From Swiss-Prot:
Record organism: Stenotrophomonas maltophilia (strain K279a)
Family of the protein in this entry: Belongs to the universal ribosomal protein uL1 family.
A GO term from the CC aspect: cytosolic large ribosomal subunit
Protein's name in the database: Large ribosomal subunit protein uL1
Keywords of the record: Repressor, Ribonucleoprotein, Ribosomal protein, RNA-binding, rRNA-binding, Translation regulation, tRNA-binding
GO MF terms, alphabetically ordered: rRNA binding; structural constituent of ribosome; tRNA binding
Name of a matching Pfam family: Ribosomal_L1
Residues that span the membrane, as ranges: none
Function: Binds directly to 23S rRNA. The L1 stalk is quite mobile in the ribosome, and is involved in E site tRNA release. Protein L1 is also a translational repressor protein, it controls the translation of the L11 operon by binding to its mRNA.
Gene: rplA
Source organism, top-level taxon: Bacteria
Keyword field contains Ribosomal protein: yes
Subunit structure: Part of the 50S ribosomal subunit.
Length: 232
């Protein structure tokens, strides 16, 4: 298949095997952004873990300081009372218990995040086949099972991203939009990497952050020189 002018320009801009300072990497991505929509800026982080071992799987969440640029719809399972009121006050689109579960079983799943208080998991547990395949099942490891639903809703809406290692030991995550300021993208990536460092498994040996690459939705992957980031 013949390459488009854009693909040729991208190929010419990125030197295979070269790691670019973060600022240069973002400039390459922004210059290659030609889609008719605002593309996302994504990151792939190869970790020094054996993803086949359960004690080396990395999973968690990070609240990006500059947000994700996305509007997030949140549903909360919480019993009627203070916790439900707290979730509604924080901006949740839907709050309930059995009534909310029935709606979801009927196909009402227009949510990006589902949160539950611990005492609501007896209801949520029955929705495993509905929420699980969509990546919506609440989990304490990523902050979506919480005794403080208001805080969890605020985190979700202010730019919380969830991550977990894939079979190759790589974390994939969105750190913003192509129209974000460079400093905003850098602060988001730094926050994510610092949380990944905190989540390093005790049994992981050798170099932990092996490779960091950024890309746009329709653009190339560019390796980032980690020395251009402040990770302390």
């Amino acid at each position: 298949m013949a390459q488009t002018k854009r693909e040729k320009a991208i190929k010419a801009a990125v030197v295979p095997g070269k790691a670019y300072a973060f600022e240069d990497a973002i400039n390459i991505l922004k210059s290659a952004t030609k889609a008719k929509f605002v593309e996302s800026i994504d990151v792939a982080v190869r970790l020094g873990v054996d993803a086949k071992k359960s004690d080396q799987q990395v999973r968690g969440s990070t609240v990006l300081p500059a947000g994700t640029g996305k509007s997030v719809r949140v549903a909360v399972f919480a019993p009627a009372g203070a916790k439900a009121d707290e979730a509604l006050a924080a901006g949740a689109e839907a709050v309930g218990m059995d009534d909310l579960a029935e709606k979801m079983q009927a196909g009402d799943l227009n949510y990006d995040v589902v949160i539950a208080t611990p005492d609501a998991m007896r209801v949520v547990g029955k929705l495993g086949t509905v929420l699980g395949p969509r990546g919506l099942m609440p989990n304490p490891k990523v902050g979506t099972v919480s005794p403080n639903p208001g805080e969890a809703v605020k985190n979700a809406k202010s730019g919380q991203v969830r991550y977990r290692t894939d079979k190759a030991g790589i974390i994939h995550c969105t750190i913003g939009k192509a129209d974000f300021a460079e400093d905003a993208l850098k602060s988001n990536l730094t926050a994510l990497l610092l949380d990944l460092i905190k989540a390093k498994p005790a049994t992981s040996k050798g170099t932990y952050l092996q490779k960091v690459s950024v890309s746009s939705t329709m653009g190339p992957g560019v390796t980032v020189d980690q020395s251009s980031l402040t990770l302390k």
